[in-house]
Amino acid sequence: MSGHSKWHNIQAKKGKNDAAKGRIFTKIGRELILAARDGGSNPDTNAKLRDVIAKAKAANMPNDTIDRAIKKGAGELEGITYEEIVYEGYAPGGVAVMVKCLTDNRNRSAASVRHKFDKYGGNLGANGCVSYMFQRKGQLVIEKTDEIDEDELMMQALEAGAEDFSAEEEVFEITTDPEDFSAVREELEKNGYTFLEADVTMIPDVMAAVDMETAPKTQKLLDMLEEDDDVQDVYHNAEYPEEFEG
């Protein structure tokens, strides 16, 4: 899959869209609140919070914004209580879609997600209808540069506990067990690497090839889901034609 990796298909457009809409701080803020609520406000003893803080800093989120979100999650500041809900369904072309929401209103989120699936040619299904097609994995993506030695990076990643390493056209992709994600990320950071993407995500086992006629319809639904205020992440297995720009 060189040059046409799962990360390229699944993550590149998502990251671009979030950045263009200026929504990423809001999404990371919710993750910080949830991580601090579930595991406490001390990143030394809360690996999930440590990971989200690293993600926030990589996105250039201001320190005071990070601190406020953590305090809200820990109950030190008044804030909204969020719960995580995952919806599953299909986009045009038989593309499997998982929609992760962090919401303070379950009914609002359910109605909004269902409306978007109905309006843009998808089908919202029952829990479990597509999740079996995905695996929860840690994913680290590093941009290829002349300064990075591929063999050295691979050895460092595998020795740190990574499950898999692949070299694509423009990036290196490192996959970990979710439990090992923090350790691998921190070890590579100590060795001077920076990441285009570093997160625990849902990686599809099989991609669904989408033709040029269907691709705009598929992407439209995915875009509209990502624009929803309650939606945190959209995972899918669409594999677009090389010439499709999105």
Swiss-Prot record:
GO MF annotation, one: DNA binding
**Some GO term, biological process aspect, for this entry: which one?**
regulation of DNA-templated transcription
Q: Which residues cross the membrane?
A: none
Q: Which Gene3D superfamilies match?
A: 1.10.10.200, 3.30.70.980
Q: Tell me which UniProt keywords the record has, alphabetically.
A: Cytoplasm, DNA-binding, Transcription, Transcription regulation
Compartment(s) where it occurs, according to its Swiss-Prot or TrEMBL record: Cytoplasm
Q: Which family does it belong to?
A: Belongs to the TACO1 family.
Query: Record's PANTHER family?
Result: TRANSCRIPTIONAL REGULATORY PROTEIN YEBC-RELATED (PTHR12532:SF6), TRANSLATIONAL ACTIVATOR OF CYTOCHROME C OXIDASE 1 (PTHR12532)
Identify this protein by name. Answer: Probable transcriptional regulatory protein NT01CX_1819
Q: Native species of this protein?
A: Clostridium novyi (strain NT)
> Lineage from the top down?
Bacteria, Bacillati, Bacillota, Clostridia, Eubacteriales
